[in-house]
Amino acid sequence: MASAVERTDDLVREYLIYRGFTSTLKHLDSEIKTDKEKGFRVDKIMDQLQLLIQSCDLTGLKEYWANLERRLFCRLEDVYKPTVSKLRTSLYRFYLIHTVQVKNVEKTQEFFQKQALELQAQAEWRDWFSLPFIPAPEQNPSFSAYFSRQWADTFLVSLHNFLSVLFQCMPLPALLSFDSEVQRITSLQEDNEQLRQTVFALQGESRLKKDEQMVHHKLPPYVQHMDRLGDTELDLVSSQRNVNMATPSRNFFSTFLPQGRRAPGRTAPGPQSSPTQSALGRKDAAASMQSSKAKDKEVKPPSVSSMTAELSTSHPRQRRHQDHEKERKELFSKHAAQGSEKKTDSDPDTQTEAPPDQTDSANQTRVCDVGGAGAEQPFIKLSQEEYGEHHSSIMHCRVDCSGRRVASLDVDGVVKVWAFNPIMQTKATIMSKSPLLSLEWAAKPDRLLLLGSGVGTVKLYDTDAKKCLYEMTIDDVHPRILSLACSPSGTSFVCSAAAHSGAVMESEPRGSAPVSGQLLLWDTKTVKQQLQFALEPGPVAINCTAFNHNGNLLVTGAADGIIRLFDMQRYESALSWKAHDGEVYSVEFSYDENTVFSIGEDGKFVQWNIHRCGVKQSEYSLSQDAVGPFVLSGYSGYKQVQVPRGRLFAFDSEGQHVLTCSSTGGNIYRLNKAEAGLESVLSLAGHKAPVVTVDWCSAMDCGTCLTASMDGKIKLSTLLAQKP
């Protein structure tokens, strides 16, 4: 209910601004600030009650409780009135115990003076009037239980639960019921998307299985036409069979590979067709296309009649029939391996006159080659699309939490919000007067986008309404907002602000000395700074930030090469260690969140154990194409250099594979032990300029990989995960 109230308040505020009712908006804001129900947020109400108790404000406590009874408890049925009375009694006793614990005798006596008329007739308060006169009430058997921490916690939890259930059961006005409809529609859309992805994955698996079965059960072309062969042609089959037996047998998966990727041990056929192929070509000439007829005329094999005459003089008719029967037995005894063995390679000219079954086999090879060698690869690349709305180098490219939209930022400060399902379509274009350096999707709600600028401000942009909701001034001394990270569990976000680096352009490499900076915590609801983190040994620019799944941990990589791990429950640094020689460019939690991965200026891709400070679990060396700075060269000595700003690597849904940048696309590696190194499993090529940032969004068995390059092009590759 609290979220629905907050959302409704925002919508009403937006409507009043749209209508120009500024005075009404001012009254609304002032009343929201003094709202005693705190937007029906139980945690805020509990905080207010405890604040009044800790300040020993008896009058304020009575007025606040009376307001709750007048606004909330009066709507309850009579059967719940004893519960409300018991909670009020426990609240007053909680107040009294606090005054005794802080040794504020005046407040203790004041309570009994003001409440004497109301409480002296109640039997449960009869013994409590002696409380101010007992020297050590915490040791008295009548009061010792109330001084225990267990009783206080039990009371607070009971009151919290009572208010929570009350808010859930309260009848809602019609205006507030929209939130349940929005949640229901959103849930249906998510279920729809998951089912669509499931159907898509099942269709891909079904197509692969069907194609595999076709390869298993496909017979060699000469066997399919065996019934139509005459005696003379059987002799040619036998002679061709003897030639084929001398060649090494093929592996079954070689049928999935294109001609260029097959094993070098195989000898390619000559430019001249075999007698069998030419004979079959003439037998099927009536059913083939005109192009096949033309090519058949170009190929001039040896005369069939002359070869038949030679074979007939050396082999009797009975021997030919025996060879024929032996041929059939050998065929059916070696079903799958024999079928792939008898399938012969041919040059482009002879492929045109092959029967239809050979064309099907060629199609099968093409489909499986989309993702590599079929079962040998963990992913199959189903498709690759290009988004080309940007006209300069990309800095950031991120998919939102729902996996439906993408936000991309280029060096000109242009932000594009676009969808790729079911079709690629631009939803919003954001152009800022000030240069933009960073972006991040908000976790709740996921329609909001945070944009960090180079003049010390962060904008909160609504991608649905296509307008800026707020512009927060972060720091004038540290105007460059290098990194943004939203907490998955709330409305707060972490902001990294840095001083000017001294470079002429943002895309130029930074100097050797670490740049000064701050790490701040802000709230998108209150639009206020909550905290400034302490950075040891001194203030330094934080290049990258990342939360774990529940927002309890925050990992950062800085310009001084140090990785810092923060406890977000205590808002303090838990660990820090020197990770790289030079700056830390990108950092992420692993799938199980027991380790942290980082890429630094030294070209190292390192896995760190967060339970053992500074201990490397694995280390890999990457090329400059994957680390940066990225260089784009052109004609007449043109050269563009860009330092890393976005994510340099991203994991799949199970954390077993990682996507990195390269000069022509993205590379997917399998994470092995340190001594085994990174194992390349798939290359997502297609770019003509260096890729500078990547992202990987997984849904069901299908994953979407984003690779963005310096020429403004973004490639969207759809992958199908193959289950082992």
UniProtKB/Swiss-Prot annotation:
The modification Phosphoserine is found at residue 274. It holds the Pfam family CTLH_Armc9. This is WD repeat-containing protein 91. GO terms for biological process: early endosome to late endosome transport; negative regulation of phosphatidylinositol 3-kinase/protein kinase B signal transduction. Residues 249-365 are annotated as: Disordered. WD repeats lie at residues 389-428, 431-471, 499-532, 537-576, 579-618, 641-679, 686-724. InterPro entries: ARMC9_CTLH-like_dom (IPR056327), WD40/YVTN_repeat-like_dom_sf (IPR015943), WD40_repeat_dom_sf (IPR036322), WD40_rpt (IPR001680), WDR91 (IPR039724). Signal peptide: none annotated. It is a peripheral membrane protein. One of its GO terms (cellular component) is endosome membrane. Keywords: Coiled coil, Endosome, Membrane, Phosphoprotein, Repeat, WD repeat. It is found in: Early endosome membrane; Late endosome membrane. It comes from the Eukaryota. Residues 270-279, 303-315, 349-365 have a biased composition (Polar residues). Belongs to the WD repeat WDR91 family. Functions as a negative regulator of the PI3 kinase/PI3K activity associated with endosomal membranes. By modifying the phosphatidylinositol 3-phosphate/PtdInsP3 content of endosomal membranes may regulate endosome fusion, recycling, sorting and early to late endosome transport. Residues 178-207 form a coiled coil. PROSITE patterns: WD_REPEATS_2, WD_REPEATS_REGION.
